[in-house]
């Protein structure tokens, strides 16, 4: 009776060893290198802080236009990453380019006054165009994966990035003067005399900043296959400041991570 038990034990042990060896082989065949592609929805926050009237910087003249005071913009952009998985910890380098934010405004101001025997109307028209563009962001992240089970892996991390932000402003102001003579006695009012000329030369300015910014990231990875992971994530990034203008982004993303 003993030999069959011994044979069964040996057979079971050999099968168990074979399965473990195969699993180890499959796990060992997974490269630590990976690439990831994401589509991100970004909420961009541009805040223009003016100096206090009694503060130390009260006399400082800003080169950043008032176009960029408390802007709330949104954009969708792609992002690509390459990384290395240490088994629990990952590092990744990423690159993204954002959509240019643009704004135009038009204003009209009319002033009417009496000058001797005439009515004088002065109309001032202002046309302004502004743009703010986070042209590029090159970042490096350190990420920690929480392995809840074989499929779901929440993660958190920190990111440092080199970003380039620039803005441009162009404005034109035109003044139109209309003079109409008053009626006198039985004489009707005279026809208007109109004169149009630029009240100010066209104005243009362009400034940019390149600096290191800091951010945090979090998300959840779902392993579809041993090599393919669906990733949903959030990241916050502070781009730094261009004088008294701060630029920050909140991003939600969906992407795929492929391990070689």
Curated annotation (Swiss-Prot):
Keyword Secreted: yes or no? no
Disordered: annotated span: 173-205
Lineage: superkingdom: Bacteria
Q: Which GO terms describe its molecular function?
A: porin activity
What InterPro entries does UniProt report for this protein, alphabetically?
A: OMP/PagP_b-brl (IPR011250), Opacity (IPR016373), Porin_opacity (IPR003394)
Provide a GO CC annotation, any one: cell outer membrane
What the entry lists under Pfam families is as follows:
Opacity
Its subcellular locations are: Cell outer membrane
Primary location recorded for the protein, binned into one broad class: membrane
Keywords (alphabetical) are: Cell outer membrane, Membrane, Transmembrane, Transmembrane beta strand
Q: Which spans does this entry mark as compositional bias, Low complexity? A: 174-186
What family is this?
Belongs to the opacity porin family.
What is the designated name of this protein?
Opacity-related protein POPM1
Could you tell me which species this protein originates from? Answer: Neisseria meningitidis serogroup C
User: Which gene is transcribed and translated to give this protein?
Assistant: opr
């Amino acid at each position: 009776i003993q030999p069959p038990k011994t044979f069964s034990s040996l057979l079971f042990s050999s099968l168990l060893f074979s399965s473990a060896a195969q699993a180890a082989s499959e796990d060992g065949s997974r490269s630590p290198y990976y690439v990831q592609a994401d589509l991100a929805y970004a909420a961009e926050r541009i805040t223009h802080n003016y100096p206090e009237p009694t503060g130390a910087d009260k006399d400082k003249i800003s080169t950043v236009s008032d176009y960029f005071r408390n802007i709330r913009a949104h954009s969708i952009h792609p992002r690509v990453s390459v990384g290395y998985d240490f088994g629990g910890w990952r590092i990744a380098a990423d690159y993204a380019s954002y959509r240019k934010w643009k704004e135009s405004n038009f204003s009209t101001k009319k002033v009417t006054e009496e000058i001797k025997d005439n009515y004088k109307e002065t109309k001032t028209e202002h046309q302004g165009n502004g743009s703010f563009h986070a042209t590029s962001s090159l970042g490096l992240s350190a990420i920690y994966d929480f392995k809840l089970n074989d499929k779901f892996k929440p993660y958190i991390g920190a990111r440092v990035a080199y970003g380039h932000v620039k803005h441009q402003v162009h404005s034109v102001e035109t003044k139109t003067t209309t003079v109409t003579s008053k009626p006198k006695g039985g004489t009707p009012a005279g026809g208007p005399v109109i004169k149009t000329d630029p009240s100010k030369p066209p104005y243009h300015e362009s400034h940019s900043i390149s600096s290191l910014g800091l951010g945090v990231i979090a998300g959840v990875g779902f392993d579809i296959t041993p090599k393919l992971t669906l990733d949903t994530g959030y990241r916050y990034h502070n781009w730094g400041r261009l004088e008294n203008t701060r630029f920050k982004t909140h991003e939600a993303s969906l992407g795929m991570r492929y391990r070689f």
